[in-house]
Amino acid sequence: MKTAIIGYPRIGENRELKFAIEKYWKNEITENELLKIAEEIRRNQWLKQKEEKISFIPGNTFSFYDGILDTIILLNAIPKHYRDLGLNELNTYFAIARGYQGEKGDVKALSMRKWYNTNYHYMVPELDDYAKIKLNADKIFSELEEAKKLGVNTHPSVIGPFTFYKLAKTTGNKDKREYLGNIINVYIELLEKCNEKNIEWVQIEEPQLVTDQTEEDIKLFEEVYTEILKNKKDVKVLLQTYFGDVRDCYGTIIELDFDGIGLDFTEGRKTEKLIAENGFPKDKVLFAGVVNGKNIWKCDYRKVLNILNNLKGKAENIVVTTSCSLLHVPYTLRNEEKLTENILKHFSFAEEKLGELRELGELSQILSENSLEKTQENEFYIKNQEIITSKRGMEDKEVRDKVEKLTDNDFVRKGTRKERQRIQREKLNIPLLATTTIGSFPQTKEVKLNRSKFRKNEINKEEYDKNVFNFIKECVKLQEKIGLDVLVHGEYERNDMVEFFGENLAGYVFTEKAWVQSYGTRCVKPPIIFGDVKRTKPISVLYSEYAQKLTEKPVKGMLTGPVTILNWSFPREDVSLSEMAFQIGLAIREEVLDLEKAGIRIIQIDEAALREKLPLRKEDWHKEYLDWGLKAFRLCHSGVKVDTQIHTHMCYSQFEDIIKDIDNMDADVITFEASRSKLTILDFLKENNFETEVGPGVYDIHSPRVPSVEEIVTALDRMIEKIGKDKLWVNPDCGLKTRGIVETVKSLENLVKATEIVKSRL
């Protein structure tokens, strides 16, 4: 049986692309040198996929920054202010992604949002009145030729017009529908060019179809593809979906003239039922997404073969594929030298999933000609089940008992919000329009070297901590000099807001090189929840307590919340998400109470990733996620005194639809990203009478540009107009870890100056 994948990691096995792009940004390598490195990355992954006998290898899945940004280029939908910079093609591309500040102009980046329910971010397309939508497919065809020269047959893969249209926003006076005809024409022309080049298949990805669809949405989808598909000629079109099922529009999809349909059998809870009740067309190929593209556990062949066995007689032509792009998992287990084989055998990264697909392709072929029982006699199946059924260990009865004994009172905080606000203002002496940062400060070469030496056992813990304390001392001095009101210790002891806590919690295991792209060149190395989670010792208390002793101003204790730790880890598949969240919540609760005992009066519990795992179907939001997610957060802070102020922070997300739920987290202050999205959330805060004190980010830290005093004043004026001065905090939109120290200082100085100007008017 044939096999396929939807996409593949593009950062390079050892993050070669990340380092090359960052060198290019610093003018340390040329464009040609960057292109050569990119070509080598593509070469390696194509040859690996060919080696593992993948039948359908997608092209155009490589990107220098983001696939949606590549689609903006494909459609020539570049907003005018980026074109007007007069930069070359590659630098214009990066200006859209990062913003630009230089002799040719000063523009902000496009806004970023989470890619459905993943930790990946995409650039939000903006259609302005000057947009001239037309095909620009040079990248697609050059990469196809590149693969062909290697003896690898690939097919074009593109984000579909329906998804692009739904994710895009307009910034001018034109109605969005005015762009639709030209968008459709681009895809028609793309298929025509593919036909001219005798390309057999084109993969068009439409993940938007797995979200709630209205009748109007379905009508739009049908309109778009009726027009496109009648022009496909000899090209076969694969409609690829992922991240869920297509329950709202399955009937429409199977009636349209697609040649292949890719469905998710991993997260798509109703996919099997849809086929059982409605059938699957005999003239179409079913690309069955049965290998989990999001998680890192070894695939359970028993479950996969059961699905494929159930499809017998319902779908005649099946291709075994992944549930989504392998972009969301690390490259390979080959480079993991510190974990034991007893642990590693349970995992499967991108490269290993190719091997699983090869084995499943063979097993599926056997199954198509034999019974399920006969297929299960195969050596591949037997070896797989030996691993799947083997015990992992790391169970902790004490932790499980604690979770089981939790009562409603464990999730309720002392004092009403109004009482707490009054007491905290008095005790903490917090001024109006208090200025602060989100937590981390730039990770300089010295900070990274200190951590690297410690990890390599070149320095001991005492020397490591001594260096960290020096970094903290300088950070506190710097913040006092700038004039911030509420300080942070800089987080120099942690390389990642989740990995740091995971390293100090029982139940986690850690990799050396299992990097995953979050956005652009930002990569994360998610820890793996391998067993029951508990805190074995204080984690951050030492550093926060030291920082507080250096100043009279309040210093925030900095923690990561249970939902974010869970969402930014690779979770177990043998226990529920709620069970894991409560276990982590109990561990963070212990840390919160220890910080309070150490004299830390403001404690920030970041829930940067709360929104991103919200189920894609609204009917599932509370029962499948928010009901336990909000409780896990409240469990962390319900034991503190009324005069201890609890902060939380959220990163790039759409909050408008869960504003009331965020209020129900019962934090005292929330900070979040707002600058890239042009502060649109302010209206929703006002409409919903949001009670929590709030700090919408006044400038974008994901761009190297320094905000002017004037633009921060303008942002603050707008915030005060919408939500008033009494509940407003002033801060950047995220942590400063990835920024340079010079731009950080300039930006924060401008933030404080702008705040003083606004305060002088009140």
Residue ranges of predicted features:
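Domain-level signal for soluble alpha/beta catalytic cores
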Residues: 1-762
